[in-house]
């Protein structure tokens, strides 16, 4: 495969005669994104695991995602949270620890998740809709420049 260059890999994978798990694993170990060209009927959990270990973005081509697969991906690359089919709190937490900007891929970020994200990178406040005062305070404490994304104070109960 090396001599063909990366642009032709998808075509070559489709033309493969040997669809053994061993051969397919060798392919995805070279480039995890080749998973997209492997027919679903030949994919196994083992092939999925090798693909996502080589490139966490391969998660987008995994039909049957497990919690463990998703955790492995977001621990390496937080923004792969966007490919997680069934987000759970622990997966979101791990993604945020790795890359706080992945808050934009949380379906419904909790207060705790927002606090975690801004405690690591205060500038992430710009990606949070209607942050609580506590989230704002944490963001500014982490990075003074986060103030530029905090437009106005939260309404008080008297307003």
What does each of the following model-derived ranges do?
Residues 1-159:
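Alpha-helical scaffold segments
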């Amino acid at each position: 495969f090396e001599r063909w260059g990366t642009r032709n890999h998808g075509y070559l994978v489709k033309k493969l005669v040997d669809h053994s798990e061993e051969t397919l694993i060798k392919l995805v170990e070279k480039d995890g994104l080749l998973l997209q060209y492997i027919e679903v009927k030949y994919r196994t959990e083992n092939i999925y695991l090798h693909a996502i270990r080589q490139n966490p973005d391969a998660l987008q081509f995994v039909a049957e995602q497990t919690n463990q697969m998703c955790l492995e991906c977001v621990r390496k690359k937080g923004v792969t949270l966007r490919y997680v089919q069934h987000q759970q709190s622990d997966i979101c937490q791990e993604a945020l620890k790795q890359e706080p900007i992945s808050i934009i891929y949380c379906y419904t970020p909790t207060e705790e998740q927002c606090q975690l994200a801004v405690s690591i990178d205060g500038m992430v406040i710009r990606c949070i809709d209607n942050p609580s005062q506590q989230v704002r305070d944490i963001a500014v404490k982490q990075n003074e420049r986060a103030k530029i994304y905090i437009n106005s104070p939260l309404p008080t109960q008297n307003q």
